[in-house]
Amino acid sequence: MCIRDSAIAFLVDAAALASQQAVFKVCSYGPYRRILKRIITEEGFHMRFGEERMLRIAEGTDFQREMFQQSIDDWWWPSLQLFGPDSRPDDVLLRWHIKSERNEVLRFQWVQKFVPLLHDYGFTVPDPGLTFDSEEGHWISGPIDWTPLEPVSYTHLTLPTILLV
């Protein structure tokens, strides 16, 4: 596995896993819930493998660390975008118990986990708007550019299409 793939496994697969676990937690649609159990197992393996690789790279050469940092720079924003824009107040997937958490809550929890991890191993987060709220004790990410995702926006999809995505 190359260094770039390690960053993808560490960041993107972890975001996918968090999103899928939120669906699995309360999903009322049996066939989807059953297949998610297998998918979550697989995504968990990928995320743990990426984390293990990140730990090794953190102790590696300067060149390896620079390559991993470049991959973090490339994949940070797509990882945040994976959660989707903030959920609508009338989110049908929440109302029908297809998922358990709002997109912004999942994204917030993911940031709380991964910013400290990256910092602890000497990597930087490529978010110029990232701040730490010392009163609340949590990280606040900067604004997300949704422009690259507009062609596949959920506002243009029907419910059956969303379930297949």
Model-derived regions: residue spans:
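Alpha-helical bundle segments that constitute or directly flank the non-heme di-iron/ferroxidase center
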Residues: 3-26, 80-84
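Extended, helix-rich structural scaffolds rather than catalytic motifs
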Residues: 65-157
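Conserved small/polar residues in nucleotide/adenosyl-binding loops
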Residues: 1-5, 155-161
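Inter-helical turn/loop segments and adjacent helix faces that build the functional surface
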Residues: 20-38, 52-67, 90, 94
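Alpha-helical transition-metal enzyme core signature, strongest for iron centers
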Residues: 9-17, 36-50, 75-79
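Amphipathic, non-membrane alpha-helical segments in soluble helical-bundle scaffolds
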Residues: 3-13, 33, 65, 69, ...
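Hydrophobic/aromatic-lined pockets within catalytic cores
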Residues: 24-28, 44, 48-62, 76, ...
